[in-house]
Amino acid sequence: MVKVGKWIARHRILMLLIGVLLIIPSVIGIAKTKVNYDLLSYLPDHLETVKGQDILVDEFGMGAFSMVAVENMDMKDVQKLEKEFEKVPHVQDVLWYDDVADISLPTEMIPKDIRKAFINGDATMMLVLFDDTTSSDNSMEALTQLRKIANKQCFISGMTGIVTDIKNIAMKELPIYVVIAALLSLVVLEITSGSFVVPFLFLLSIGLAILYNLGSNIILGETSYITQALTAVLQLGVTMDYSIFLLNSYEENKKRFPGEKERAMGHAIANTFKSVVGSSVTTVAGFIALCVMTFALGRDLGIVMAKGVVIGVICCVTILPALILVFDKPIEKTRHKLLLSNMDRPSAFITKHYKVWIVAFLVLLLPAIYGNNHTKIYYNIADSLPATLNSNVSIKKVKDDFGTSNMHIVMMDKNMSAKDKQQMFKKIDKVKGVKWTISMSSLIGPSVPDSMIPKDVRRVRIMNWHSSVRNMNPQQIR
């Protein structure tokens, strides 16, 4: 390994040239790697949720829907808004109470089930159906267009709106927190290193490694937005130690081989590789362990981060040594006294009183266990987003106006008898958290023949399945 290290040291310009050239395919790879915002796509195919979504897309031609609350608007204007929504690409349909009742009818004459679902005082609700899945690009583009059409009296809620806001936040804030992480690392390195130039070389080397890792994601075809958001910061934190180890080894070998910097770097590369391989293998193994998760998001993150660690090690023993040798003179000229030059006294104190420290950490273990067992875990992704976001404002408005913030579509076999359907509906209505249920039979009665069902009502009944809507208040479900 020493021979390889010496070869890298001698051909440092070649190493840097290769490193610069690799930026080109990396940038192309990043541009062509799709970012997946659909968490459902990472669920196993055998789950009912996934099966249901596939049926919705394949047989009903829809996979996502949004609830739209409209306040203080004349019914004719709401109807015009409905028609505008229907013209938006990838909007499969818009359901409102005018599909089953004339808007000229007094509110009191509208069937109770329809009135309860679509009208509450000065507020009314529409259901917008998309022709693609919840987090698809098509659905998010359609929702963005709906928001542009809607005025201040309209509030569009639903998972597609949440995902759209997450996408916008991620694209806006990702560069910001990566820069913050880099600046914080730079401050720490400036305090702990002996040269003002070295920290910049560390960040440049790791930055290239991150770029290569993100570019190589093209082999996966796509990565989740969570993986994309975490990769840069995680890789920076995980691989920084490798760079520090190389520099320390180089400084020691310079004393061992005075005036022979290439030889010193060759030995430093060999020593670093031998030491880093062990720690990096355990790190890679930890990330690979994520790949066994049934939830495939773990595999996505595990592969990308394991790949990032390997690339980080390679850059640490190729790109970084070349940078240090090329910028050797600036490094020497900008040397300064270590701000944290002597840690002997704190380490001696800890070593001398090790029993006290053991007892202290054992005592701290008790509140840690208690805190872990009593920390509530939330699964509503909207709770992690700012309350001022369009999606959360709309969710709150729908909840305030209609007492609910969540809706589900239940699909039944077309050949299911009316009696069985009614029995099932009654049981579902009794479930805690279910606010109301609307189905074909609840709108027109179970005894009405198919031939007499109005076209606008019949369109929600397709092929081998019937659809039924359940409106729920998730906060009532425990």
Residue ranges: model-predicted function:
Residues Y37-D45, Y379-T388:
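Membrane-proximal, lumen/periplasm-facing interface regions of secretory-pathway glyco-
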Residues D45-F65, V70-V163, P386-R478:
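Structured non-transmembrane domains adjacent to transmembrane bundles in polytopic membrane proteins
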